[in-house]
Amino acid sequence: MTSPRQLAAIMFTDIVGYTHMMQSDEKKAVALLKHYNATLEKWVTQHGGRVANYYGDGSLCIFNSATSAVQCAVDIQKELRQEPVVPLRIGLHIGEVIFEEDKAIGDGVNIASRIQSLGRENTVLISSDIHDKIKNNSSFSTTSLGHFDFKNINKPIEVFALSNDGLLVPERKKLSGKVKSKNNVRRYVYILLSTIVIGI
């Protein structure tokens, strides 16, 4: 039996530094997690999405509309940067999602996860595919952070940061996430150039 597939706007969220929070003040960390879960579910439902998976202190949410997904992310961050502050990072991408045993998987999910991994607290980072869908919407402001080579992703992806009032636009040099090491990139370029030279 073929697993159900759906083209969707995918939103990944993650609480920054949650493991450290648990180690330093478990009671506070648990309270923040409950606040985060309630806020997430409220806004995802309001914007017509659904929470597909929870991952401890993170989540994967699915939307039929890129605009709805991005507005949901903005609303979540707006609420969670108020007291009690939850340091959240969010990444979004559009792609095909495969549903297996109540879990959402697929390349689109992996890319959204990689984009989220770049973020810092109070950031909303989006792929160029999401950006193409919202770039003419005056409700959103964006700043390009450049192209990134993510682990286990075939090609570089341009990532944009939402720059609406109150959101953090991180400096590229301060970003770290699930990206290929510079040595691997150099090795790939060397192999590619060697192949071209041999072909000549």
Residue ranges and their predicted role:
Residues A38, T45, L60-P156, F160-S163:
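Catalytic beta-strand-to-alpha-helix segment of the class III nucleotidyl cyclase homology domain
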Residues T2, H35, Q82, I90, ...:
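Bimodal feature
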Residues M1-C72, E79:
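Catalytic NTP-binding/metal-coordinating core of nucleotidyl cyclase/transferase enzymes
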Residues A8, T19, V51, E101, ...:
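Generic secretory/membrane-interface signal
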Residues L162-I200:
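Long, domain-scale regions corresponding to catalytic signaling modules most often appended to membrane systems
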Residues M22, I62, A66, I105, ...:
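Generic alpha-helix initiation/capping and coil-helix boundary signal
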Residues Y18, F99, L167-V169:
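Short, acidic Gly/Pro/Ser/Thr-rich loop/turn segments
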Residues Y54, I90, R187-Y188:
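Hydrophobic alpha-helical segments, especially transmembrane helices
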